[in-house]
Regions:
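Sec/Tat signal peptide C-region and signal peptidase I cleavage site
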Residues: 17-21
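Short cysteine clusters
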Residues: 40-43
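Bacterial N-terminal signal peptides
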Residues: 7-13
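Short sequence/structural segments immediately N-terminal
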Residues: 29-30, 35-36, 86, 103-104
Length: 104
């Protein structure tokens, strides 16, 4: 039973990850940019450019939304978890920004 539930949840995550940045509202992308500047730019670089030692998020796969959310919420390698700082809708806004590639 647990395996069926896991597969169902994974399937939903994969389907939702297919949403493109264009599906995000401009307001959500803007909110994500603001959150990024406040919380992420120190390590990932201003506007995702020239990260000092963290991953260059401009190269993050656009079809890896579940991986992005898991990394932000639970941390990964040198990145701390942000689950006690960011709300789910804020992580969604960050994804909208990151997956948009900051074209400005």
């Amino acid at each position: 039973m647990k395996r069926v539930a896991f597969v169902a949840i994974l399937g939903l995550a994969l389907v939702s990850s297919k949403a493109k940045a264009e599906d995000s509202s401009p307001a959500q992308v803007q909110k994500g940019a603001e959150l990024f500047a406040l919380n992420c730019a120190t390590c990932h670089g201003t506007r995702m450019r020239n990260p000092q030692w963290a991953i260059d998020l401009r190269t993050f796969p656009k079809d890896a939304k579940p991986r992005f959310i898991d990394s932000v919420m639970n941390g990964k390698r040198n990145m701390p978890p942000w689950d006690d700082v960011l709300k789910n809708e804020e992580v969604e806004a960050l994804w909208a920004y990151v997956s948009s590639g900051d074209r400005d």
